[in-house]
Amino acid sequence: MKDTTKKIPTKKKNSINVVKHNSLINIKSDEAFTVSQKKLVCHLIANIKPKEVDFPIKEVALKDLGFIDDNMQNYTWFRKEFLQLLKMPFIIPNDGGWANWFSYLKYEKGIIKYSFDPRLKPFLLELKGNFTMYNLDNVLNLKTNYAITLFELLMKNIGIGKLKMEIEEFMKIMNLPNYPNGELKRYLTRIQKEIIENTIINFSFEFVKQGAKAKYILFKIKNKASKKDLQSNVEETKNLLKNGKQQEMFNEEIVVAAIETKIEDNNQSLRDKFKNLRMINDRQ
């Protein structure tokens, strides 16, 4: 019998990746960024070219951002939402300095003109290591700013497979209110569902006590990609390396995920391959 089930077209996947130094994953600010602000920042970071050494003024069409709805087409709303980023400095961990995401932002006739803050050059340009990388679609699919922040924290640690943080520190990075643990658990359960349904990550979490009181949150993290997909991505990465494109295309996310599933090729473990790729990348 002929299958008459209607095929649902799959959404075209973005081919661009967000790459940022791990210090930018743990930023703290006095005011929480909105989900639209976070998506804008991620999208514009993904537009940085691998060989760029400076932050020129660039432009992007509002309609090309991939997360704009009818409400966002309103100029007044857009100006209030995005230009507010110029007034939202954050502290860079392990640096101690305050920075804004942008030194220049302008919106005119559906076009955003922007330039990143030059103080962010060491954290966004010519990265050799200690960075997190993921496909842009992961954050574009999320619906809350808290889900985006937690997704990045988990991606940073996906190669290790776990993340343990003090609850107090976690709340500061997430910019969450001072929830009691019971309410925090319920809230995290909602965020967990959102992340698992919309990104490449699967994870669980639990509170860890010190004495009689819970002091830490422990996340256990897995990549949802199939073994077959990971092997295919590893082969693609190897071909790119063969063609001399290691600086442009070195995909830490793919290799770490492959290590996690213990895929091996030509009797050499991917852990060793990853180490070799690091050495190649550091020489660029």
Task: Please give the residue ranges for each predicted region.
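Charged, alpha-helix-forming regions
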Residues: M1-R283
